[in-house]
Regions:
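Mixed-charge, Lys/Arg-enriched low-complexity segments
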Residues: 2-3, 39-86
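Amphipathic, interaction-prone secondary-structure segments
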Residues: 5-36
Length: 86
């Protein structure tokens, strides 16, 4: 196999101007997906064992990200991100 059990892949991604980190870890029979904020705090995480689980997990993680944005940012933060899109 390409990835060994225990391997961790990381990726920075952006939602509405806010940066998050995606951490994916291969386990024996599943993949652990965790979304982290800029400080490395876990926002949400799930175990996925097949493609059907993946699509459900992605919907749940997106919802968690939008909840985090709502609870951890203010109007000025959102305005700054809108301006920075120019």
């Amino acid at each position: 196999m390409y990835y060994k059990t225990g391997d961790v892949c990381r990726k920075i991604f952006n939602v509405d101007g806010f940066d998050f980190q995606l951490r994916v870890k291969k386990r024996a029979y599943s993949v652990e997906i965790v979304v982290l904020d800029q400080e490395g705090n876990s926002i949400d995480g799930l175990l996925v064992s097949d493609e059907n689980d993946l699509y459900t997990a992605l919907d749940i993680l997106k919802q968690s990200i939008y909840e985090w944005i709502e609870n951890n940012t203010d109007e000025q933060d959102r305005l700054i991100n809108l301006v920075m899109k120019w």
